[in-house]
Structure formats: C-alpha cells, structure tokens
C-alpha cells in the first residue's frame, strides 16, 4: 500500500506575535510540493472540529512557540484533551521564538507526547526570531536556515508515519498499550 501519509499541521492562531498562521501556511505550501503527504491545517482553538482529522491522521507536525522557556498553556490543553489520538503516531516540530528558536518548547513537548505514546521524531525545524523575516504584506520569507532541516524532517516523518501505520494495521496499538 503506497497511499499518502495523512499529515495534520497543528498551530495556534492566538499566539502573541500572530506568526503561527503565517508559518503554518508556509509549511503547508512546502508540504504540498511533496507527493507523499496529504496535508490538513488545524487551529488549536477549534478543538471539536479537530477530532475527526486527528483520528484519521498518520502523523502530526506541531508549531511550538517558546514562551518562558516552555510551550503555551493552550497547546498543553489541546494535547491533553485529545490524548488518545496521539498513540503510535509520529510527531514532528517547528519551533520558533527568540534566540533559542523554540528548542526548549520542543524539548518539553517531546517528553509530554512520549508520555501520550506518540513517537516524537529526532529532526525538527527551529526558527530564531522568525518575525524579522515578515515582509510588509505579512508574508514570511523563508530563511535559508529552514530549507534543509524542513526537508530532513519531512523525510523522517514520512518514514515513521508509514512504519507506524503498517504496525497499527497489523495490530491495533490499543491491544499492546494496556
């Protein structure tokens, strides 16, 4: 079976800098150029509408804004409210923030999602001060720092998504997680 990987991009539209939707659109456009993914953008404020998409997902890509060396309370609430949906699915991250580029938020999210039986992948994209690359129209101009890490992350995410989807089809994760 060689069907597309159903990838859900999760972002917060209410982040203080209002850059998450901009970055999500950029990532969605990059992913749309790749034949292996079917992509869906999901705003964390739309929790009820999210469930069908999360249930069908093979993989997740989370945008993590770093706030006080961690991630937002809204994202934490979203993760907790849809806990069962993460099981045996890979998760990748695009972190953003000040000089750290969101690396602290990503580190915390990896721990939390591993506790939810998700599989956080190693590669991530970290964007230091991404709002500095917004043009006058509010369009994010892709920095060279993002191209190679994004490609590497998507290759790994595709591999993990297919491997875990195959494993879930052979034996549902619920049967081995108890």
What is the role of each PLM region?
Residues 2-35:
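N-terminal beta1-alpha1 ligand-phosphate binding loop
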Residues 49-120:
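Helix-loop-strand module that forms the ligand-binding subsite of alpha/beta enzymes
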Residues 35-46:
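A short beta-strand-loop structural module common to alpha/beta enzyme folds
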């Amino acid at each position: 079976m060689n069907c597309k990987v159903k990838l859900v991009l999760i972002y917060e539209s209410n982040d203080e800098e209002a850059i998450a939707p901009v970055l999500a659109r950029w990532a969605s456009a990059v992913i749309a150029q790749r034949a292996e993914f079917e992509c869906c953008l999901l705003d964390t404020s739309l929790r009820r509408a999210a469930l069908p998409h999360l249930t069908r997902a093979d993989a997740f890509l989370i945008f993590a804004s770093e706030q006080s060396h961690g991630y937002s309370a809204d994202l934490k609430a979203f993760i907790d409210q849809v806990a069962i949906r993460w099981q045996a699915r890979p998760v990748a991250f695009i972190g953003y923030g000040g000089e750290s580029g969101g690396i602290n938020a990503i580190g915390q999210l990896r721990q939390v999602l591993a506790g939810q039986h998700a599989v956080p992948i190693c590669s991530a994209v970290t964007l230091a001060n991404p709002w500095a690359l917004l043009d006058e129209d509010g369009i994010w101009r892709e920095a060279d720092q993002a191209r190679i890490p994004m490609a590497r992350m998507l290759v790994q995410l595709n591999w993990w998504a297919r491997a875990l989807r195959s494993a879930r089809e052979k034996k549902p994760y619920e049967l081995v997680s108890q």
